[in-house]
Amino acid sequence: MSRTLAAMMVAVLTTSPLAAQEREFGRQRQAPAIEINLPYDGRYSFARIRYGSTGGGGFGRDRMMWAHDYPRAELNFTKILAEVSTVGARLGSSSVITLDDPALFDHTIAYIVEVGAWAPNESEMAALRRWLQRGGFLIVDDFDSRDWFNFESQMALVLPGARLQPVPLTHPIFDSFYRITTFDQVRHPYSGVQTTFWGIYEDNDPAKRLILLANRDGDIAEFWEFSDQGFFPMDLSNEAYKLGINYIIYALTR
């Protein structure tokens, strides 16, 4: 485990107002303050894809599949990203956008979860296709093998002919900032199933740019969300942060 990153996590996250609030209220966690969809100013802003809800309104994390781990995951993640790298990350904010929102094109990187419930319409599929082809990078997280068929089917409509392929440990994305030497500690936080990594490459060529990376049987944002609570072992949270940071650095430098 990287002791430097682990120490940084403790220093940055446990001294934050959010962490103090969490300790005060225990399991009755209060929603942290967050600014949403601020005008683009050139800095990296965490962009989460919003899609059809399962009921309710607002940003309730239990009401909408797209909002799982929101907003604590991205708030914690951007703090760590800003501390350990030179990425100009925008803190205390998040962009929550639909795929057919023109604001998507202000972002190089976007994040989507629970793709077993994802059913983009024609407009959203067309926009995602254009965005990926113009240099966008999509991170797919928080889903398991039961969701795979729907995800694979939807991506076949978004990018006809594109193939989801295993992404090996030797791929540059796993050495873009931190050197990931094993996947042994990368598992689903609750089922314990080993996470596997799947991607889509430009022209289906592994030598070309990776335009999408999916954490199958994984949920790295769950570790981000609770990393200031001691809910998961520090080494597992550490690995989740390293993966996320590598994804960002890879996408910004390719």
Q: Where are the model-predicted features located?
A:
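Aromatic-Pro/Gly-enriched surface loop or interdomain linker
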Residues: 20-109, 115-116, 219-254
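Short alpha-beta junction capping motif
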Residues: 46, 104, 109-150
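Extracytoplasmic/secreted envelope proteins and their assembly/folding machinery
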Residues: 74-78, 125, 129, 152, ...
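Hydrophobic/aromatic-lined pockets within catalytic cores
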Residues: 136, 159-160, 252
